[in-house]
Structure formats: structure tokens, C-alpha cells
């Protein structure tokens, strides 16, 4: 029957009335209601089963929905360097490079771009930033972190968080706390004094929570002073939720929970990736017996619901389909960060920028010249496209200058080695389920080579084509003593082991070839294991080969290097060699030092570009080259940024967020890493990084806060004056004395009174300012210090204390280049 207008009107009135009644009965659905009232309503309506189910993650990266109450499924994504897990995305520079910009405004811009990319994929929660202190130079995740200094790390972290969350996406600050090495990270007990925690390892987290207003914190895998971080009552309940009044959600790292009562009472709100210990079956009996209180459970549920309601997740779609996934605005931010991140460490005799009317040919060589160098693990992002250093130079120099690329080992070498690769007898090939924790063998056969293209099909009739692990085991025998290269091409995660030692462990791009070198003895058998994982992310197949390592440079390549007007050697690490799960080597890998030395021998105009998350050994070659750039992992636009700096289109302005020691033994943590017997003792206490170098009088190769420019700056006219609100204004002039505009980072340090009995560092960073100055421009800069800038943590008083006496306020261009000094008397 066709409805009459009256029926339509009555129907509309009925719907409106029903909607009004629904809002009255369910304040949780009333967008105009306060968040607390909406959460109260949801708490009343949730069943106990639903409450307990919310405390464990679902399908790896989700929080469970409650559809009947309008509570949506909440989607998460790694990580700190861009949106991972859901296909290609903008690959930003490593955040240690962002910290090297000393630019909090840029950090906020970076966070906002990441948040926008997240909305383009319907992501509610980003699992970043990562803000642990760079204590150990070899830490595999240093590239994800920010600095050895807590003030700089906190200033950058707070703005990343604010930027992400301004887009309607939750930021997750990780890894809480003292997760400063990957070696034994799942079990190691970090023994750290409360003073060192309060002064060094916790301030960046505190800044992210109190200044950035982070909605989520992720606990670390390790133990801290005896207790796993996921169940550490002092860390989670007293400090985070007590002292800092954190109202958000504390989640576990993936698989970091170890028992139900420990994590429930120890402050954990959400177990990820699933509720192995935080589920109705495990929690229910403990609540009934009184081991876990209902109030404890309700607090966790309330925190999760408050996060969801306050961030609008119940009221709007999270997906912004109008935002492109490959967003040129995000790419522009990635380029800006990459440019500001680059630190010019050495520039003798004006080797840089590469300019001149007679410039005709630049040779670019090294393993990172033509690819995308990036750190590995959960922070690794696969971009839609990228610009290599070779590509970047070709773009900026035009047709008048030839860019002569000499690539490192790649697919072409792999193909030539495949025909020569042999094994000692047949290989055992096992197929297993893809489940990382509980692999089950499906089938076992023999194979004669590892050279297969399975595409979308199954490698064996009984194997699921979408999800499987294949493992080959066998032996090889070297025909001669010398260095040999091992190469593999795969789509997915792949590991290669030689006599039990891991040579390759990385996600692989099917268009590239991973490689590692190792010395072998003639006639000796070596056990080989190759394991490849396929998880339906692309065509399946694997190609593995080994053979004699190629020469550092062929005769033809050497001639090209000798004849070049400039040589750029791109060295460092990559996703296979530096990343989550293991700490990296201190020395440059494979034959990279020999490559630098050979290039420098052939051509004195050799410039080195290093990609790494931190310090690398330089003693063997630093005296042989005139120029050195620390480019970190510069992201998808990194090749263009490096090229811009090399040719002078961009004036380098980055400054080290870490200290660059001359040798590994000089690091304050040396001798207190990686620990033994399941424990690592942070015996250096608060003397981390430059605090240790300066206090103990050890000269670094390049100090904290150091970075050269193509122009020069001078400092003058320091004034330190009290303000009406009890703070101190540090005012000084900075002048650009050179012929090129540039950015300068001015650093403000505080030194304790000479009468101090508190065992304080010689100086500590307490403020900074980044400014752009045109040629001959003078700018007056003011940095304001609050009372906390003069305090230390007194363990006996369990409080921050300001000692009476005369403090020195220092202004400089690095921790070892103090240019101005004044005094503040606190009596």
C-alpha cells in the first residue's frame, strides 16, 4: 500500500520520538553528552563477559567491538615511522633523524602527516612514537628512538604525539621503560636506579603524557628491577598512573604479558595481540577469589571506553576516503624532515658542496647508493615509491653533469651465482604452518637447489598457498679459503644461517637481493639453513645462491672512480642489518670500510654518506676522506634530500642528538652491556651519553649537539634575567657571518654549583632554539628556564631538589662548543 502523507508524517514523528527515547535511555549515544557520562552509561550496560573481553586484543591489531552498544572495532597500526600493516604508505625518515633537526614544530608537522596517513586507512591507534633513550650505540632500534638526552627526546616526543592526535588518531608512546637494547629484550632484567630512571629514562615518556597528552602507552618486553614492565606496579601504577595522572590506556607490547594476576594488578589495561592472559576464562576465577578486584577491572574498561569516546570513535567513521593513501602532502613532509635531519660531520677544505663550472662527472657507489636504506622490524614501511641518492643527484644536477652509478651486489649478481651454486648432497625441505609461535610441520621432501617461482600457487599439494613457512637445511663446502657472498631473493620474511649464525634476517623485496659476506675455509663443510615465510602478500618464490665475493672494485670501476670530479660513497646498514629483534654490529658491514679506503686512495675528492641509526666505527677511514654526512635512514624522499645537501641546494642544519665516540670502549655504557645471567646493570647511572663524556673528560669524535653548516655563526650579548613568574630568561644574539642563509640550533646547558654534593653531570641540556638567519642577519634569541632546569632527583627524599648555590648557564653550538656563559644564584 502506498503511504499517505499523513502516514509518512506520523511515521517520521515516530522515528524521531524513538530516536529521542533512545538518546534518553542511552546517553552513550548522545554526542552532546560529556564523555564521562557516556562512559558511565556504557559501563552500566556492559555485561561482565563483555568487559573482560575488551581487555584482550583481537586479530593481532584490533580491540574488540560491542556492536549492540555501538562500540566499534578499533584498528591499530605500526609504527613510529609511518603507517604499516595495510599496504604501501609514506615512508618517513627515522625519528632519530627527526630529533637531529632539533625542530619541535617539524615534529608536530611530522606527527600530523602520520595521523593523516592513518585516517586514510581507517586506523584509530598508531603504535608510536618510540622514545627510549639511546644508551647503547649498537641497539638495533636506536633509529626509532630520539636521543641520548631526555630533554631533547621529550621536546620532540611531545610534539609528535600532539601532531598525530590532532588528526583524530591516538598516539601510543613506547616502550615503557628502559628498553634500551634488543639483545635478550624479552627476558633481560634492567637494573636501574630510581634517580637514573627519573632523570634519564622516564622524562621523554612523561613529556609525551603531560605535554603531548598521549592517550596510550605501550609497555616494554624487558624486566625492570626484577618485574616485567607489563606487571611492574611501581612503574605503571605509582609513576605512570599516579605521579603523572595518566588517564589513558596502558597496553602490552605484542606477547609481553606473562601471567594473569601480575599484569592485571600491575597496571596493564589491554593485552596485545590477543587476550592470552586477559580474557574472561582467566580473569573470572581470580575476580571471584578476590585476587583481582572488580574495581581494578572496571578501571581498565573505563580507560578503554574513555579513549574511544573522547576521540570520537563512536561518532564517526575513522576512514577518511577523501585523503589519498599516497598523499603528496605527506611526501612533502617526509622530504622536509629528511633535509633537516642530515648532519654534516666533516667538511675539510670545502669538499662540500660539490660545485664548480668544471664539474662534469660524479661517481656514486656503495650498497646504499641505488636503493632505499631503512631500518627493519615493525617500524619498516614499504613506500609507494622512493628516490635513491643516484636518482636524487640526477634530478638536481641536470644533464650537464653525468651521474655514474656503480651499484653494489644485486639481482644481476644473484642470477650469475645461481648457475654455480652447489650443495653437499640433497637439501631437506620442510613445509610448516606460518604461525610464528606454534609451527607445525606439514610435509618434508628433498630438494637440490633453492631456486623456485611458485607465484600464487602452492609449493606442494598439501600446503596452503596463502600461508606457509619453507625451510631448507643442508651443507656447503668452500672450494678455497676467502670471503664468500650469500644472496637471497624472496617476497616475505627470510632468514639465512651459516653454522647456526644468522647472516640474513629480514623482510625481502622481490625486486632486490639481500646479501651478506662471511669468511670460509677451503674444504670445511658448513651447515646452511634458509627459511622463507609467505603470508599471501604477493607472489611466492625464493632464490638463494652463494659464491666467491666480488672484488671491492673491478679495474673498470676503479678507473671510473679515479677520473671522477667527485665520488660519493653511500654506506651503512639496512633493514636486514639493523632493526628490531637484534642489536647490530658496530663496524660497517661486509667490505664497506675497504670500499671507502679504496675510493679515497683513487680519488681525494671522496665524500662518505652513512645510513645508520647511530654511531658506526670510523677509526680506519675517517682520516682518509674530506667529508662525511650522517643521513640516518632518510625515508622515501631521502635520496633527493641527500643530493640537495651534496650540491648545496640545501644548507645542512642537523645536529647530533647523540654523541659520536671515537671507539666503542669510550661509550659510558661500555662494560655494562649486554649484561650476563639475565641482568644488565646500568652502572653508569645518570652519566649517559655526553653527560658521561663531559663529566669524565673523555673526548668524543663528534660531540652531542654538533653539526657543521655551509655558513658560520657567532654568539654574543648573553643576559640571564629572572622573570616575574619565577623563571629565568636566557637571552643572546646569534649572527650569520657567512655568504649563505642557514639554520642554527642554539643550545642552553646548566652546570651545577661547584659546591654540589649530589654527583651531578658537568652540564645538562635544559633548552634550545632553532632559527633561520639570512646572510649577515643577527637575531636575538630567548630561551626560558623553569625551576626544574636546576633540579636533580633526590632518592632519599623521593622528590626533585634544587641545591642552593651559583649555577652556570651556558650557551653553545654543541656540548663541547660553549660560547657564552652566565650565572644564576639560587640561595
Annotate the PLM regions.
Residues 22-485, 489-792, 801, 806-816:
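Glycoside hydrolase catalytic-domain context in secreted enzymes
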Residues 9-18:
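Bacterial N-terminal signal peptides
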Residues 817-827:
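Short beta-strand elements
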Amino acid at each position: 500500500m502506498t503511504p499517505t502523507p499523513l502516514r509518512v508524517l506520523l511515521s517520521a514523528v515516530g522515528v524521531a520520538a524513538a530516536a529521542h527515547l533512545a538518546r534518553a535511555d542511552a546517553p552513550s549515544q548522545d554526542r552532546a553528552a560529556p564523555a564521562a557520562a557516556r562512559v558511565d552509561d556504557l559501563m552500566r550496560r556492559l555485561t561482565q563477559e563483555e568487559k573482560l573481553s575488551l581487555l584482550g586484543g583481537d586479530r593481532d591489531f584490533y580491540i574488540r567491538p560491542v556492536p549492540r552498544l555501538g562500540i566499534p572495532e578499533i584498528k591499530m597500526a605500526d609504527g613510529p615511522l609511518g603507517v604499516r600493516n595495510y599496504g604501501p604508505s609514506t615512508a618517513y625518515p627515522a625519528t632519530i633523524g627527526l630529533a637531529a633537526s632539533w625542530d619541535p614544530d617539524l615534529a608536530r608537522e611530522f606527527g600530523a602527516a602520520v595521523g593523516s596517513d592513518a585516517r586514510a586507512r581507517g586506523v584509530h591507534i598508531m603504535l608510536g612514537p618510540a622514545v627510549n633513550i639511546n644508551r647503547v650505540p649498537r641497539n638495533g632500534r636506536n633509529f626509532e628512538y630520539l636521543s641520548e638526552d631526555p630533554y631533547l627526546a621529550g621536546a620532540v616526543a611531545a610534539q609528535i604525539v600532539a601532531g598525530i592526535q590532532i588528526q583524530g588518531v591516538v598516539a601510543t608512546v613506547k616502550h615503557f621503560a628502559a628498553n634500551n637494547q634488543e639483545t635478550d629484550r624479552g627476558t633481560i632484567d634492567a637494573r636501574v636506579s630510581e634517580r637514573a630512571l627519573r632523570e634519564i629514562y622516564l622524562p621523554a615518556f612523561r613529556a609525551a603524557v603531560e605535554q603531548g597528552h598521549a592517550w596510550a602507552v605501550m609497555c616494554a618486553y624487558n624486566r625492570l628491577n626484577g618485574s616485567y614492565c607489563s606487571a611492574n606496579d611501581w612503574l605503571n601504577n605509582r609513576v605512570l598512573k599516579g605521579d603523572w595522572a595518566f588517564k589513558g590506556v596502558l597496553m602490552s607490547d605484542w606477547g609481553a604479558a606473562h601471567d594473569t594476576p601480575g599484569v592485571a594488578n600491575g597496571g596493564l589495561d589491554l593485552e596485545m595481540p590477543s587476550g592470552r592472559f586477559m580474557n574472561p576464562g582467566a580473569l573470572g576465577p581470580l575476580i571471584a577469589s578476590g585476587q583481582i578486584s572488580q574495581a581494578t577491572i572496571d578501571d581498565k574498561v573505563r580507560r578503554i571506553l574513555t579513549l574511544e569516546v573522547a576521540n570520537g570513535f563512536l561518532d564517526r567513521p575513522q576512514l577518511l576516503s577523501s585523503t589519498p593513501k599516497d598523499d603528496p602532502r605527506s611526501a612533502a613532509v617526509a622530504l622536509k624532515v629528511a633535509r633537516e635531519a642530515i648532519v654534516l660531520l666533516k667538511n675539510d677544505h670545502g669538499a662540500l658542496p660539490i660545485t664548480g663550472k668544471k664539474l662534469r662527472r660524479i661517481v656514486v657507489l656503495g650498497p646504499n647508493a641505488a636503493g632505499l636504506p631503512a631500518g627493519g622490524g615493525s617500524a619498516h614501511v614499504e613506500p609507494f615509491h622512493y628516490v635513491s641518492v643516484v636518482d636524487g643527484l640526477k634530478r638536481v644536477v641536470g644533464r650537464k653533469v653525468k651521474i655514474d652509478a656503480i651499484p653494489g651486489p644485486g639481482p644481476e649478481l644473484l642470477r650469475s651465482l645461481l648457475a654455480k651454486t652447489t650443495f653437499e648432497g640433497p637439501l631437506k625441505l620442510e613445509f610448516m604452518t606460518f604461525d610464528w609461535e606454534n609451527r607445525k610441520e606439514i610435509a618434508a621432501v628433498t630438494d637440490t637447489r633453492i631456486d623456485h617461482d611458485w607465484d600464487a600457487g602452492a609449493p606442494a599439494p598439501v600446503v596452503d598457498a596463502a600461508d606457509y613457512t619453507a625451510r631448507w637445511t643442508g651443507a656447503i663446502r668452500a672450494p678455497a679459503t676467502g670471503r664468500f657472498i650469500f644472496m637471497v631473493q624472496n617476497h616475505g620474511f627470510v632468514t639465512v644461517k651459516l653454522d647456526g649464525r644468522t647472516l640474513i634476517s629480514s623482510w625481502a623485496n622481490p625486486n632486490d637481493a639481500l646479501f651478506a659476506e662471511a669468511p670460509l675455509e677451503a674444504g670445511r663443510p658448513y651447515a646452511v639453513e634458509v627459511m622463507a615465510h609467505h603470508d599471501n602478500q604477493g607472489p611466492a618464490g625464493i632464490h638463494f645462491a652463494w659464491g666467491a665475493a666480488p672484488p671491492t672494485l673491478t679495474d673498470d670501476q676503479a678507473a671510473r672512480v679515479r677520473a671522477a670530479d667527485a665520488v660519493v660513497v653511500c654506506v651503512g646498514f639496512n633493514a636486514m642489518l639493523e632493526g628490531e629483534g637484534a642489536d647490530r654490529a658496530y663496524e660497517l658491514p661486509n667490505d664497506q670500510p675497504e670500499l671507502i679506503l679504496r675510493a679515497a686512495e683513487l680519488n681525494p675528492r671522496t665524500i662518505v654518506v652513512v645510513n645508520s641509526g647511530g654511531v658506526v666505527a670510523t677509526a680506519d677511514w675517517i682520516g682518509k676522506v674530506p667529508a662525511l654526512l650522517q643521513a640516518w635512514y632518510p625515508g622515501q624522499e631521502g635520496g633527493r634530500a641527500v643530493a640537495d645537501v651534496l650540491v648545496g641546494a640545501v644548507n645542512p642544519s642537523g645536529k647530533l642528538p647523540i654523541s659520536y665516540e671515537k671507539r666503542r670502549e669510550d661509550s659510558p655504557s661500555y662494560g655494562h652491556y649486554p649484561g650476563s645471567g639475565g641482568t644488565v646493570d646500568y652502572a653508569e647511572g645518570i652519566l649517559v651519553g655526553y653527560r658521561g663524556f663531559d663529566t669524565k673528560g673523555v673526548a668524543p669524535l663528534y660531540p652531542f649537539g654538533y653539526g657543521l653548516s655551509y655558513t658560520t655563526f657567532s654568539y654574543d650579548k648573553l643576559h640571564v634575567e629572572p622573570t616575574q613568574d619565577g623563571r629565568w630568561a636566557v637571552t643572546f644574539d646569534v649572527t650569520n657571518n657567512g655568504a649563505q642563509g642557514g639554520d642554527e640550533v642554539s643550545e642552553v646547558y646548566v652546570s651545577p654549583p661547584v659546591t654540589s654534593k649530589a654527583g651531578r653531570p658537568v652540564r645538562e641540556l635544559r633548552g634550545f632554539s632553532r632559527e633561520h638567519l639570512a646572510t649577515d642577519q643577527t637575531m636575538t634569541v630567548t630561551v626560558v628556564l623553569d625551576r626544574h632546569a636546576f633540579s636533580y632527583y633526590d632518592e632519599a627524599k623521593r622528590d626533585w631538589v634544587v641545591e642552593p648555590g651559583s649555577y652556570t648557564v651556558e650557551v653553545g653550538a654543541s656540548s663541547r662548543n660553549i660560547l657564552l656563559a652566565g650565572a644564576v644564584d639560587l640561595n
